[in-house]
């Protein structure tokens, strides 16, 4: 009985804090026993919403809640599961959980429910990763991509790719068995064509995943400009609250400031950078270096200029940075447009600058940002949603490339070896059974109760 209890896990599945409803999840062989103990019900029907009182180990009433029992294997984890839907808040849910744990049930580790679902064959790793990412989705488009992956879109690609590699591998094994025979040209061409097609498909998926990665991670938008052009004021205006210190003293912002803000259907990472100029101040120089680093990995760059001041060498330096980043999405904005315009616009007119001030221009700016974000994220291509997935398909692609030369030279054992490595790599996307460390790391990033 003790082992039965310890093999059963429990956790609060909803966010900690004030809410209308909280959910406590219990999974394992003792789940039904615990449900009966704390509800005092003698009969609990599967998939039936029981409105019941819940009691602690001293028989004191905790709350009235909805209790649902999912009989194995027809549950998320494939095990016996009971879920308690109680009134929200920080006290009631915790007392119910404490009562469950007092009977010898173990507190679940982060991601342990999903890990059990994986080991019980209810989900594969692509679906598990999609569940984890969906919780943190940064846009509507991201949620759609992740929902498709939860339904098996990536798993289908993995299975199809694996089958194609296994067919080529089967050919090679037959050819090894009949090594004295010449390999027919049409079989050779068929294998090469199949492998080339798979490599091209993988490259397209990887390229699309890098290009659209901001859908999953959150697109990064960096504001750059010389000191005291109003970058921090722009950040505060876009956030709708004062996050950065605003001062007339040049160089007030000495480090990058990053915050999340919603633009249209996207949650972006908005970065206010230190003013870029020549400086002998050690601290300011570090801030400028970080500014340049933020620019390099940003999806969109807002280059801000002060319309109330004449164009100078520091503005020229900002434009030089912008000119060198033609592969980036650039928005040029002229700040303080409500003051007398002194900035010579000839140098920046080709960028179709947007005029902004403390009183106007932000609607046009946010609409342009939204349009760019939509264009970066658009596409129907399959996406890889984690570094682990990208690394696996790249290993498969490299192994396929390594296999082609031995095939052309008739070195079938080497061809077979590289193809087996490709099969292992592509299969590891959905089922890397050979590495407990990978599984622990991946499921450990899930939230508690998931």
Swiss-Prot record:
Gene3D superfamilies linked to this entry: P-loop containing nucleotide triphosphate hydrolases, Probable tRNA modification gtpase trme, domain 1, tRNA modification GTPase MnmE domain 2
Co-factor requirement: K(+)
Subcellular location: Cytoplasm
Main location per the UniProt record: cytoplasm
Binding site for K(+): 228, 247, 249, 252
Biological process, per Gene Ontology: tRNA methylation; tRNA wobble uridine modification
Keyword Metal-binding: yes
Domain TrmE-type G: 218-377
EC number: 3.6.-.-
Keywords: Cytoplasm, GTP-binding, Hydrolase, Magnesium, Metal-binding, Nucleotide-binding, Potassium, tRNA processing
Residues that coordinate or bind Mg(2+): 232, 253
Stated family: Belongs to the TRAFAC class TrmE-Era-EngA-EngB-Septin-like GTPase superfamily. TrmE GTPase family.
Name of this chain's protein: tRNA modification GTPase MnmE
Organism expressing this protein natively: Sulfurovum sp. (strain NBC37-1)
Gene that this sequence comes from: mnmE
């Amino acid at each position: 009985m003790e082992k039965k209890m310890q093999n059963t896990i429990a956790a609060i599945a909803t966010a900690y804090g004030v809410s209308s409803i909280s959910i406590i999840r219990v999974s394992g062989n003792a789940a039904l026993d615990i449900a009966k103990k704390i509800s005092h019900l003698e009969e609990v029907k599967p998939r039936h919403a029981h409105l019941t009182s819940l009691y602690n180990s001293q028989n004191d009433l905790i709350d009235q809640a909805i209790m649902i029992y999912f009989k194995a294997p027809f549950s998320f984890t494939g095990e016996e599961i009971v879920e308690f839907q109680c009134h929200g808040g920080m006290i009631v849910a915790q007392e119910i959980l404490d009562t469950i744990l007092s009977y010898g049930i173990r507190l679940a580790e982060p991601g342990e429910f999903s890990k059990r679902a994986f080991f019980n064959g209810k989900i594969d790793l692509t679906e598990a990763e999609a569940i984890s990412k969906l919780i943190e989705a940064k846009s509507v488009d991201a949620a759609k991509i992740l929902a498709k992956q939860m339904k098996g879109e990536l798993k289908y690609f993995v299975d199809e790719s694996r089958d194609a590699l296994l067919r080529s591998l089967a050919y090679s094994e037959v050819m090894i068995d009949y090594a004295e025979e010449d390999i027919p040209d049409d079989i050779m061409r068929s294998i090469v064509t199949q492998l080339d097609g798979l490599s091209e498909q993988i490259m397209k998926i990887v390229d699309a995943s890098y290009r659209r990665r901001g859908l999953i991670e959150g697109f990064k938008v960096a504001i750059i400009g010389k000191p005291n052009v109003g970058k921090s004021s722009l950040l505060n205006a876009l956030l709708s609250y004062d996050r950065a210190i605003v001062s007339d003293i040049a160089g007030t912002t000495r480090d990058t400031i990053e915050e999340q803000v919603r633009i249209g259907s996207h949650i972006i990472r908005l970065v206010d950078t230190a003013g870029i100029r020549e400086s002998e101040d050690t601290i300011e120089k570090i801030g400028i270096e970080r500014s340049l680093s933020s620019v390099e990995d940003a999806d969109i760059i807002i280059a801000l200029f002060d319309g109330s001041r004449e164009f100078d060498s520091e503005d020229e330096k900002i434009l030089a940075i912008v000119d060198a980043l033609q592969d980036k999405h650039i928005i040029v904005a002229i700040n303080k447009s409500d003051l007398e315009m002194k900035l010579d616009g000839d140098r920046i007119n080709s960028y179709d600058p947007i005029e902004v001030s403390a009183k106007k221009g932000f609607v046009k700016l946010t609409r342009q940002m939204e349009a760019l974000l939509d264009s970066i994220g658009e596409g129907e291509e399959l996406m890889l949603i984690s570094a682990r997935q990208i690394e696996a398909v790249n290993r498969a692609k490299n192994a396929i490339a390594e296999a082609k030369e031995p095939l052309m030279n008739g070195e079938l054992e080497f061809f077979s070896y590289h193809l087996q490595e490709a099969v292992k790599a592509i299969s590891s996307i959905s089922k890397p059974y050979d590495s407990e460390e990978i599984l622990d790391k991946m499921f450990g990033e899930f939230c508690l109760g998931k």
